[in-house]
């Protein structure tokens, strides 16, 4: 097991404060959502979901050449810098086999979401090809609309509906397909009540009353599942064994550090050859992802150099 110290990734484009003047030029809608902090500095009204969406539109257009992006009301509006960090750390993980980041990597995004955020960043930053899976037909339609509205993305991103209840890789990874890595932002609550309580905590932390608009929306499949994050990732680990020769690295975000021990035990049980934990940080927010493989060093080198 190896670990690496936290911090925003060096290649992340979002180290400095947002250049709001430039972002407002990119997306003039953002201007109406600017506010002043108690210190008198200009900021974005992060408690307003329309403001967060307008900021994301500007960031994706300015930094990632995604000119047309939108999501339906009620779906998660992800913070772009944190999502980019996962992609950059994943790139480093893929580079360890050959010493360079593969330019033609094939990545599977489990739960691509209405926002399609990971493929959008990964295609722009590294030229990777993505397959995105999703259980929700509405989320899939939204992601496809984003792909279709931006020239070139149709060649780089394809979407698949997960029709098998409770399945993660089964039904999505086809017989002769190979992926350099999978990624996933799993549902972290174990019930709708727990998800609501989480939103209440965020609301209180922002000093909002319960009627105020929130940017922490999300559909059921985005926020919770039976047994929560640990059960979901354990299921992923269990299924991954069946695709040990088709996928080099399986990865998943883990929202809470205390969830790691049962996941490590599950990885030992399925015979993972190597397990890696990557720590990430954005401001005060700490996050991490775990990665596991069933291939040894030599097998991973051969996998990276395979015919594509």
From Swiss-Prot:
Its EC number is 2.1.1.181. GO terms for molecular function: 23S rRNA (adenine(1618)-N(6))-methyltransferase activity. The keyword Zinc does not apply. GO terms for biological process: rRNA base methylation. It catalyses: adenosine(1618) in 23S rRNA + S-adenosyl-L-methionine = N(6)-methyladenosine(1618) in 23S rRNA + S-adenosyl-L-homocysteine + H(+). Its main location: cytoplasm. One of its GO terms (cellular component) is cytoplasm. Belongs to the methyltransferase superfamily. METTL16/RlmF family. HAMAP family: 23SrRNA_methyltr_F. This is Ribosomal RNA large subunit methyltransferase F. The gene is rlmF.
């Amino acid at each position: 097991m190896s670990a690496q110290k936290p911090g925003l990734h060096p290649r992340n484009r979002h180290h400095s404060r947002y250049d709001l003047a430039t972002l407002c030029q990119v997306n003039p809608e953002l201007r109406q959502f600017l506010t002043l902090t108690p210190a008198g500095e200009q900021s974005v009204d992060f408690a307003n979901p329309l403001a967060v969406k307008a900021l994301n539109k500007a960031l994706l257009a300015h930094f990632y050449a995604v000119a047309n992006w939108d999501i339906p009301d009620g779906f998660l509006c992800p913070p772009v810098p944190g999502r980019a960090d996962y992609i950059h750390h994943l790139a480093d993980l893929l580079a360890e086999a050959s010493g360079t980041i593969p330019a033609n990597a094939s990545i599977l995004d489990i739960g691509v979401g209405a926002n399609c955020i990971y493929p959008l960043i990964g295609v722009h930053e590294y030229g990777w090809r993505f397959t995105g899976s999703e259980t929700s037909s509405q989320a899939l339609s939204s992601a496809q609309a984003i792909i279709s509205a931006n020239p070139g993305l149709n060649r780089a991103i394809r979407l698949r509906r997960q029709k098998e209840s409770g399945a993660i890789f089964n039904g999505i990874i086809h017989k002769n397909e190979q992926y350099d890595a999978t990624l996933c932002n799993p549902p972290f609550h174990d019930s709708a009540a727990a998800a609501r309580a989480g939103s209440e905590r965020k609301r209180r932390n922002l000093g909002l009353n319960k009627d105020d608009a929130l940017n922490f929306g999300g559909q059921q499949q985005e926020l919770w599942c039976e047994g929560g994050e640990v059960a979901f990732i354990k299921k992923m680990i269990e299924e991954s064994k069946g695709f040990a020769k088709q996928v080099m690295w399986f990865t998943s975000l883990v929202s809470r550090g205390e969830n790691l021990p049962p996941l490590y035990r599950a990885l030992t049980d399925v015979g993972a050859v190597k397990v890696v934990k990557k720590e990430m940080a954005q401001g005060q927010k700490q996050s991490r992802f775990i990665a596991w493989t069933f291939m040894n060093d030599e097998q991973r080198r051969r996998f990276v150099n395979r015919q594509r």
